Amino acid sequence: MAALLLAAAPALADESPVPGALQQFGLLGTWAIDCARAAGPGDEYSIYAVSPSGEATLTYTRGEAFRDIVYAIRTAEPVDNDRLELQVLHLPERIQVNLVLRKEGDSVRVWSSHTPDGRMLVIDGVITGNGKDSPRFKRCGGSFSAQD
């Protein structure tokens, strides 16, 4: 399924700015804290995908025992070569969250995140709720950059 979504992405990149920005940043596909382990509470996976109709989503999965967390990606704008700003809607509630992803070597992580009312969830890569670094995700089964 992911291969089909990735195959459709180049055609969609010219039609919609969101799929194009995700592809340019090298984000489309499956990422995990540890790709060698199955998704679970200690090894979350993030999946960036574009449907054939051009709808972009971000799905966090922690295994069968947990419900996936799905976001519709509404906007994707490059901040610089290493950062991409996303506006996402948590589904099905449609709660808006703004976030900035940051590339660090061969990984990507949430660098900042906030709600429209200004509530900060992640600041400079640190989760405000627990003071821990946001997890670093590595690409599963492929190169980091769309240009590689």
List each language-model region with its residue ranges:
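Sec-dependent signal peptide recognition
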Residues: 1-3
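N-terminal helix-cap/turn-to-beta initiation motif at the start of protein domains
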Residues: 15-30
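Short beta-strand segments that buttress and anchor functional surface loops
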Residues: 32-36, 57-62, 83-91, 111-112
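N-terminal glycine/threonine-rich, aromatic-flanked beta-hairpin/loop signature
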Residues: 37-81, 133-134, 139, 144
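Broad, structure-driven detector of short, well-ordered beta-strand segments within folded domains
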Residues: 46-50, 97-103
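Intrinsically disordered, low-complexity terminal tails and linkers in eukaryotic proteins, enriched
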Residues: 88-94, 103-105
